[in-house]
Regions:
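Conserved glycine-rich cofactor-binding loop
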Residues: 14-15
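Rossmann-fold cofactor-recognition segment
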Residues: 45-58
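A hydrophobic alpha-helix adjacent to the NAD(P)-binding/active-site core of NAD(P)-dependent oxidoreductases
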Residues: 50, 95-96
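Conserved mid-core segment of classical short-chain dehydrogenase/reductases
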Residues: 79-94, 135-138
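Active-site helix of classical SDR
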Residues: 96, 107, 142
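Residue(s) in the substrate-gating loop at a strand-loop-helix junction
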Residues: 126
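C-terminal helical subdomain
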Residues: 166, 174, 178-217
Length: 239
């Protein structure tokens, strides 16, 4: 999908990859970019529409869906990542509330609009969905769950004309990764690669050098083949 003249919603748009995605969408000619944040965002470009949106707040989600109406692309970027060792169930619940249920709730709320526009859902995930990083265990669990959710949505929505993309990021220079002393890709380059993958209709997008090193083996691997095979059960059930 090309972004020119499209209406887009980016959650978690105040900083990091989310803010970079807003800027890149504008560069690529988006008609309107709704910037979903818990605290309203100010922006110099009139195409940016600030939107108060906490992805764990059902009332705000419903209000956003009503206010926006027609939508071409939903980018589920809002997330939380904290260090933990799975000893505190409240910590796991917090990560799941934002990183998993946030994606689920936003996607369900905007599905009618996306189906009508034959649009796209872009879920910003992480390579820890494939192999957990134990120092951020709850984050890893939530992203693995969100990846499975993404694959399941993909199977059900392909026949309705909605593309569902998983963005499996490696280390990117954001506040979430500030404490990690490792090489990081820039937010701007990640945003460019994400939209490049969307425009090229890549199901799974690997937007930085670390994640890109896994792309070929993942796309041609047995697990990806099984995903496609399992998706056929949906098509068979509807036949």
């Amino acid at each position: 999908m090309k972004l020119e003249n499209k209406v887009i919603l980016v959650t978690g748009a105040n900083r990091g990859i989310g803010r970079a995605l807003v800027e890149e969408a504008l560069k690529r000619g988006a008609k309107r970019v709704y910037a979903g944040t818990r605290v309203p965002l100010t922006h110099h470009d009139p195409r940016v529409m600030p939107l108060t949106l906490d992805v764990t707040n059902a009332d705000q989600i419903e209000k956003a869906a009503t206010e926006i109406g027609s939508l071409d692309m939903l980018i589920n970027n809002a997330g939380v990542a904290l260090y933990d060792d799975l000893s505190d169930p409240a910590m796991l619940e917090r990560h799941l509330a934002v990183n998993f249920y946030g994606i689920y709730s936003l996607s369900q709320a905007f599905l009618p609009a996306l189906i009508q526009r034959r649009g796209a859902i872009v879920n910003i995930l992480s390579i820890v969905a494939l192999a957990p990083l134990p120092i951020i265990a709850s984050y890893s669990v939530s992203k693995a769950a969100a990846f499975s959710l993404t694959q399941s949505f993909r199977a059900y929505l392909t026949g309705k004309g909605v593309r569902v993309h998983a963005v499996l990021t490696g280390p990117v220079d954001t506040d979430m990764n500030r404490g990690l002393d490792i090489p990081k890709a820039s937010r701007e380059s990640a945003a460019q690669a994400i939209f490049g993958g969307v425009e090229n209709e890549e199901e799974d997008i690997f937007p930085d050098p670390v994640s890109a090193s896994m792309a070929e083996s993942w796309r041609g691997g047995a697990v990806k083949a099984m995903e496609r095979q399992n998706a056929q059960f949906v098509a068979t059930d509807r036949a």
